[in-house]
Amino acid sequence: MFEVNDVVQFNENHRWCPALGIIDEVKKIKDDTRYMVAVPIPDKGTAYIYALESDNSIEKIGKAVIVYGEE
């Protein structure tokens, strides 16, 4: 199980090129857990990707120390 601010590699089961992101939200749904992964896009902003724990499409890399928007 992942936590908010975990740094993850998101590969969507090899449908997309792997990307690094930060877990922004964790939500329990029925028998699964949904993660909202914030993926920074240079000069564009942030893309938000949803992934289910059952998909096995993300793996933990580490923990974010500095997170913008928090005080």
Residue ranges and their predicted role:
Residues 31-38:
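Short aromatic-glycine-enriched beta-strand elements
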Residues 1, 15, 29-31:
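Intrinsically disordered, low-complexity regulatory regions enriched in Ser/Pro/Gly/Thr
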Residues 17-28:
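Short beta-strand-centered aromatic/proline hotspots
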Residues 38-71:
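Intrinsically disordered, low-complexity, charged/polar segments
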Residues 1-12:
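Short coil-to-beta transition motif at edge beta-strands of beta-rich domains
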Residues 7, 20-22, 46-50:
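Well-ordered beta-strand positions in beta-sheet-rich domains
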